[in-house]
Amino acid sequence: MSQSTSVFRRNGFTFKQFFVAHDRCAMKAGTDGILLGAWAPVAGVKRCLDIGAGSGLLALMLAQRTDDSVMIDAVELESEAAAQAQENINQSPWAERINVHTADILQWITQQTVRFDLIISNPPYYQQGVECATPQREQARYTTTLDHPSLLTCAAECITEEGFFCVVLPEQIGNGFTELALSMGWHLRLRTDVAENEARLPHRVLLAFSPQAGECFSDRLVIRGPDQNYSEAYTALTQAFYLFM
Protein backbone atom coordinates (compact mmCIF):
# COMPACT_ATOMS: atom_id res chain seq x y z
CA MET A 1 0.00 0.00 0.00
CA SER A 2 1.33 3.38 -0.96
CA GLN A 3 2.27 5.87 1.71
CA SER A 4 1.31 8.82 -0.51
CA THR A 5 -1.87 10.55 0.59
CA SER A 6 -3.09 12.76 -2.24
CA VAL A 7 -1.51 14.45 -5.21
CA PHE A 8 -0.48 18.02 -4.43
CA ARG A 9 -1.37 20.53 -7.14
CA ARG A 10 -2.56 24.10 -7.13
CA ASN A 11 -2.31 24.30 -3.37
CA GLY A 12 -4.79 21.53 -2.75
CA PHE A 13 -5.45 17.81 -2.64
CA THR A 14 -6.79 15.40 -5.22
CA PHE A 15 -8.97 12.71 -3.72
CA LYS A 16 -10.47 9.77 -5.59
CA GLN A 17 -13.66 11.57 -6.58
CA PHE A 18 -12.96 15.27 -6.04
CA PHE A 19 -10.30 17.96 -5.72
CA VAL A 20 -10.03 20.45 -2.84
CA ALA A 21 -8.14 23.70 -3.41
CA HIS A 22 -7.40 25.46 -0.12
CA ASP A 23 -4.86 28.18 -0.89
CA ARG A 24 -7.42 30.89 -0.03
CA CYS A 25 -8.50 29.23 3.22
CA ALA A 26 -6.95 30.11 6.56
CA MET A 27 -6.98 26.50 7.75
CA LYS A 28 -5.89 23.89 5.24
CA ALA A 29 -7.42 20.48 4.58
CA GLY A 30 -5.65 17.89 6.71
CA THR A 31 -5.87 14.66 8.64
CA ASP A 32 -8.33 15.99 11.24
CA GLY A 33 -10.92 16.87 8.63
CA ILE A 34 -10.39 13.66 6.67
CA LEU A 35 -10.83 11.60 9.83
CA LEU A 36 -14.04 13.40 10.76
CA GLY A 37 -15.53 13.28 7.27
CA ALA A 38 -14.86 9.55 6.95
CA TRP A 39 -15.96 8.69 10.51
CA ALA A 40 -19.22 10.59 11.02
CA PRO A 41 -22.28 8.27 10.97
CA VAL A 42 -24.33 8.82 7.82
CA ALA A 43 -26.79 5.91 7.85
CA GLY A 44 -30.31 7.14 7.20
CA VAL A 45 -29.48 10.85 7.07
CA LYS A 46 -31.54 13.12 4.86
CA ARG A 47 -30.04 16.54 5.55
CA CYS A 48 -26.56 17.52 6.76
CA LEU A 49 -25.03 20.75 8.07
CA ASP A 50 -21.31 21.60 7.96
CA ILE A 51 -20.51 24.39 10.43
CA GLY A 52 -17.35 26.28 9.50
CA ALA A 53 -17.03 24.73 6.07
CA GLY A 54 -13.62 26.14 5.15
CA SER A 55 -12.59 24.66 1.80
CA GLY A 56 -15.71 22.48 1.65
CA LEU A 57 -13.82 19.27 2.44
CA LEU A 58 -16.32 17.89 4.97
CA ALA A 59 -19.34 18.73 2.83
CA LEU A 60 -17.75 16.97 -0.15
CA MET A 61 -16.87 13.90 1.90
CA LEU A 62 -20.43 13.68 3.20
CA ALA A 63 -21.78 14.04 -0.32
CA GLN A 64 -19.60 11.16 -1.51
CA ARG A 65 -20.78 8.95 1.37
CA THR A 66 -24.52 9.63 1.12
CA ASP A 67 -27.37 9.00 -1.29
CA ASP A 68 -28.19 11.42 -4.10
CA SER A 69 -31.29 12.56 -2.22
CA VAL A 70 -29.29 13.92 0.74
CA MET A 71 -28.91 17.70 0.84
CA ILE A 72 -25.97 19.41 2.55
CA ASP A 73 -25.70 22.99 3.80
CA ALA A 74 -22.17 24.34 4.32
CA VAL A 75 -21.88 27.56 6.35
CA GLU A 76 -18.64 29.56 6.36
CA LEU A 77 -18.10 33.01 7.87
CA GLU A 78 -14.95 34.03 5.96
CA SER A 79 -15.83 35.19 2.45
CA GLU A 80 -12.68 34.01 0.65
CA ALA A 81 -12.92 30.53 2.14
CA ALA A 82 -16.62 30.34 1.28
CA ALA A 83 -15.88 31.37 -2.30
CA GLN A 84 -13.21 28.69 -2.61
CA ALA A 85 -15.54 26.10 -1.10
CA GLN A 86 -18.13 27.02 -3.72
CA GLU A 87 -15.57 26.62 -6.49
CA ASN A 88 -14.49 23.22 -5.16
CA ILE A 89 -18.10 22.09 -4.94
CA ASN A 90 -18.95 23.39 -8.42
CA GLN A 91 -16.17 21.20 -9.82
CA SER A 92 -17.35 18.11 -7.93
CA PRO A 93 -20.03 15.55 -8.90
CA TRP A 94 -22.35 16.87 -6.16
CA ALA A 95 -22.75 20.58 -6.92
CA GLU A 96 -26.55 20.31 -6.95
CA ARG A 97 -26.65 18.74 -3.48
CA ILE A 98 -24.41 21.17 -1.54
CA ASN A 99 -25.42 24.74 -0.74
CA VAL A 100 -22.69 27.10 0.49
CA HIS A 101 -23.73 30.00 2.70
CA THR A 102 -21.40 32.90 3.51
CA ALA A 103 -22.76 33.71 6.94
CA ASP A 104 -22.29 33.75 10.68
CA ILE A 105 -23.76 30.43 11.80
CA LEU A 106 -25.27 32.03 14.91
CA GLN A 107 -27.32 34.37 12.73
CA TRP A 108 -27.93 31.93 9.88
CA ILE A 109 -29.43 29.29 12.13
CA THR A 110 -32.14 31.65 13.42
CA GLN A 111 -33.52 31.90 9.88
CA GLN A 112 -33.81 28.14 9.31
CA THR A 113 -36.94 26.04 9.68
CA VAL A 114 -35.47 22.67 8.68
CA ARG A 115 -33.69 20.33 11.07
CA PHE A 116 -30.60 18.30 10.33
CA ASP A 117 -29.96 14.58 10.90
CA LEU A 118 -26.21 15.14 10.92
CA ILE A 119 -24.27 18.24 11.95
CA ILE A 120 -20.51 18.18 11.53
CA SER A 121 -17.80 20.64 12.53
CA ASN A 122 -14.02 20.84 12.74
CA PRO A 123 -14.25 23.74 15.19
CA PRO A 124 -11.73 26.29 16.43
CA TYR A 125 -10.30 25.35 19.78
CA TYR A 126 -7.50 27.76 20.71
CA GLN A 127 -8.11 30.46 23.28
CA GLN A 128 -6.91 33.92 22.31
CA GLY A 129 -3.13 33.92 22.60
CA VAL A 130 -0.27 34.10 20.14
CA GLU A 131 -1.10 36.46 17.31
CA CYS A 132 -1.73 34.79 13.96
CA ALA A 133 -0.32 35.92 10.64
CA THR A 134 -3.72 37.01 9.33
CA PRO A 135 -7.13 37.87 10.81
CA GLN A 136 -8.60 35.03 8.75
CA ARG A 137 -6.32 32.45 10.34
CA GLU A 138 -7.01 33.87 13.79
CA GLN A 139 -10.73 33.54 13.13
CA ALA A 140 -10.31 29.92 12.05
CA ARG A 141 -8.05 28.93 14.96
CA TYR A 142 -9.52 30.77 17.94
CA THR A 143 -12.86 30.40 19.71
CA THR A 144 -13.40 34.17 19.85
CA THR A 145 -15.86 34.16 16.92
CA LEU A 146 -17.56 30.85 17.84
CA ASP A 147 -16.98 29.56 21.35
CA HIS A 148 -17.89 26.01 22.31
CA PRO A 149 -21.04 26.83 24.35
CA SER A 150 -22.39 28.82 21.39
CA LEU A 151 -21.53 26.00 18.99
CA LEU A 152 -23.33 23.42 21.13
CA THR A 153 -26.35 25.70 21.55
CA CYS A 154 -26.47 26.36 17.83
CA ALA A 155 -26.37 22.65 17.00
CA ALA A 156 -29.08 21.89 19.57
CA GLU A 157 -31.41 24.39 17.91
CA CYS A 158 -31.39 22.68 14.53
CA ILE A 159 -30.76 18.95 15.07
CA THR A 160 -33.38 16.23 14.78
CA GLU A 161 -34.31 14.27 17.89
CA GLU A 162 -32.25 11.25 16.79
CA GLY A 163 -29.55 13.20 14.94
CA PHE A 164 -25.81 13.31 15.55
CA PHE A 165 -23.52 16.29 16.11
CA CYS A 166 -19.92 15.29 15.32
CA VAL A 167 -16.64 17.09 16.01
CA VAL A 168 -12.91 16.40 16.02
CA LEU A 169 -10.73 18.00 18.70
CA PRO A 170 -7.39 17.57 20.47
CA GLU A 171 -7.74 14.91 23.16
CA GLN A 172 -7.71 17.14 26.26
CA ILE A 173 -9.88 19.82 24.71
CA GLY A 174 -12.28 17.10 23.58
CA ASN A 175 -12.63 15.92 27.17
CA GLY A 176 -13.57 19.43 28.28
CA PHE A 177 -15.94 19.78 25.31
CA THR A 178 -17.63 16.52 26.34
CA GLU A 179 -18.14 17.71 29.92
CA LEU A 180 -19.64 20.94 28.62
CA ALA A 181 -21.92 19.12 26.18
CA LEU A 182 -23.20 16.74 28.86
CA SER A 183 -23.93 19.68 31.17
CA MET A 184 -26.02 21.24 28.38
CA GLY A 185 -28.18 18.16 27.88
CA TRP A 186 -26.33 16.39 25.07
CA HIS A 187 -25.60 12.65 25.22
CA LEU A 188 -22.27 11.22 24.05
CA ARG A 189 -23.02 8.29 21.71
CA LEU A 190 -19.76 7.65 19.85
CA ARG A 191 -16.13 8.31 20.79
CA THR A 192 -12.96 7.33 18.93
CA ASP A 193 -9.58 8.23 20.42
CA VAL A 194 -6.94 8.65 17.70
CA ALA A 195 -3.22 7.94 18.20
CA GLU A 196 -0.38 8.20 15.69
CA ASN A 197 0.82 4.69 16.62
CA GLU A 198 0.42 2.10 19.37
CA ALA A 199 3.27 3.56 21.42
CA ARG A 200 1.77 7.04 21.65
CA LEU A 201 -1.10 8.43 23.63
CA PRO A 202 -4.16 9.62 21.68
CA HIS A 203 -3.75 13.15 20.32
CA ARG A 204 -7.18 13.61 18.72
CA VAL A 205 -10.69 12.49 19.60
CA LEU A 206 -13.73 12.06 17.37
CA LEU A 207 -17.01 12.70 19.20
CA ALA A 208 -20.66 12.19 18.24
CA PHE A 209 -23.37 13.67 20.46
CA SER A 210 -27.14 13.29 20.22
CA PRO A 211 -30.15 14.87 21.95
CA GLN A 212 -31.36 11.31 22.51
CA ALA A 213 -29.93 9.18 25.30
CA GLY A 214 -28.42 5.81 24.47
CA GLU A 215 -25.40 3.60 24.86
CA CYS A 216 -22.02 5.18 24.15
CA PHE A 217 -19.69 3.19 21.91
CA SER A 218 -15.98 3.93 22.37
CA ASP A 219 -12.91 2.67 20.53
CA ARG A 220 -9.36 3.62 19.60
CA LEU A 221 -7.89 4.22 16.16
CA VAL A 222 -4.17 3.97 15.43
CA ILE A 223 -3.08 5.73 12.24
CA ARG A 224 0.20 3.89 11.60
CA GLY A 225 1.38 0.37 12.33
CA PRO A 226 4.85 -0.78 13.49
CA ASP A 227 6.16 -0.57 9.92
CA GLN A 228 4.99 3.08 9.67
CA ASN A 229 2.51 2.17 6.95
CA TYR A 230 -1.09 3.13 7.50
CA SER A 231 -2.85 0.70 9.82
CA GLU A 232 -5.59 -1.60 8.54
CA ALA A 233 -8.19 0.31 10.55
CA TYR A 234 -7.13 3.72 9.21
CA THR A 235 -6.99 2.34 5.68
CA ALA A 236 -10.47 0.86 5.99
CA LEU A 237 -11.81 4.18 7.25
CA THR A 238 -10.24 6.45 4.63
CA GLN A 239 -9.50 4.39 1.52
CA ALA A 240 -12.64 5.61 -0.26
CA PHE A 241 -10.99 9.05 -0.34
CA TYR A 242 -7.19 8.82 -0.46
CA LEU A 243 -6.04 8.57 -4.05
CA PHE A 244 -3.36 5.92 -3.60
CA MET A 245 -5.02 3.58 -1.09
Curated annotation (Swiss-Prot):
Gene Ontology molecular function: any one: tRNA (adenine-N6)-methyltransferase activity
Keyword annotations of the record: Cytoplasm, Methyltransferase, S-adenosyl-L-methionine, Transferase, tRNA processing
The UniProt record lists the keyword Hydrolase: no
Catalytic activity: adenosine(37) in tRNA1(Val) + S-adenosyl-L-methionine = N(6)-methyladenosine(37) in tRNA1(Val) + S-adenosyl-L-homocysteine + H(+)
EC number, as in UniProt: 2.1.1.223
HAMAP family: tRNA_methyltr_YfiC
Function of the protein: Specifically methylates the adenine in position 37 of tRNA(1)(Val) (anticodon cmo5UAC).
Protein name stated in the entry: tRNA1(Val) (adenine(37)-N6)-methyltransferase
Gene, per the UniProt record: yfiC
